[in-house]
Every structure is written in C-alpha cells, then in structure tokens.
Amino acid sequence: MLRPTGPDDAHHLRAIRQRPEVMYRWGTVEDEFPMGDEPTATRFTIFVGDETAGMVQYSEEDEPDYRSAEIDIFLDPRFHDQGLGPDALSALIRHLMEDRGHHRVVLSVDADNAQAIRAYEKTGFRRVGLMHKSGRVPGTSAWKDEYLMELVREPLDE
C-alpha cells in the first residue's frame, strides 16, 4: 500500500495533483514535485494494486524536547470514500511512532474540508483549535481557516 516515493512515481503523482479537486487544496504543482520541492519532507506513494492512488508525507522536528512529526496526504478523488485515507494514515503513524520514535503527530486541514476531517478523526486525531486566516486559498488572494489537529500516543513514557 505505501512505498517510498521515487522518480518513477513523479508522472502519476503530478497528474493527481493537477486534478482540480486536489489542486484546490494543494495549489499548483511545483516543477520539482515530488522529488525536490520540499527537501525536509519524506514521502510515500499510496498504491491500490499497481495503481497510484496518492501520497502521504511527513516532516520531523528532531529537537528532543519538542520531537514530533507533521503529516499531509492527498488522494486521487477516484479513491475517496473507500477507507484508503485512514488506512494510509494509520500505516504512516505506526511508522512514525514505532520506527521513528515520535509520540505526537500533527497536521493542519482546511476548516471546510469535512471529508478530510472525518478521515483524520477516524484515524484518532482530535481538533486542537481553529487557526484563522492561516493560509491563502490556492490561486486567489482570499484567506482560509484551518484546524490544527493532533494525535498523541498515550500513556507517554517519562
């Protein structure tokens, strides 16, 4: 289901990112996407069989006193409402907590993206708060609100 993103995935991921429903949330596709546009991000391509369905990514805060990971995901709209998002997120969260040693995972999501919010809550995330005018609506000068969401492993080892 998840595989580290490589150059062979670029064409398929770029095609998904250029779909209007995805571009509305993620903005225009950078020339270097997905291999060089965010050097601090680690990315995994989501597959259903042999078909590219989307991508998850994370960035890490390595400072021991603030260690956490921030994640993001997009799916080809053809794969929405099939449980694929929560499954991919669960696999990524297991990797981050079990293999990478994180106890906290955060994300931000457009406040009007009810479908994504449901998927995140199904995965165990909770809303921390609403961030007002936290980013621009891609391709416009309008501001959008986002929820900050987190998942914290309990109980924490002291």
Listing of model-derived features with the role each one plays in the protein:
Residues 81-95, 117-122:
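Conserved acetyl-CoA-binding loop-helix of GNAT-fold acetyltransferases
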Residues 21-80, 95, 152-156:
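Acetyl-CoA-dependent GNAT
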Residues 12, 70, 87, 104, ...:
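Amphipathic alpha-helical recognition patches that constitute DNA-binding helices
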Residues 85, 89, 113-116, 133-138:
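Short glycine/proline-centered loop/turn elements that form peptide/ligand docking sites
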Residues 106-109, 126-143, 148:
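Conserved catalytic-core motifs of GNAT/GCN5-like acyltransferases
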Residues 5, 75, 109:
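Hydrophobic adenine-recognition pocket in adenosine-nucleotide-binding enzymes
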Residues 1-35, 146, 155-158:
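A short, well-structured alpha-helix characteristic of acyl/acetyltransferase catalytic modules
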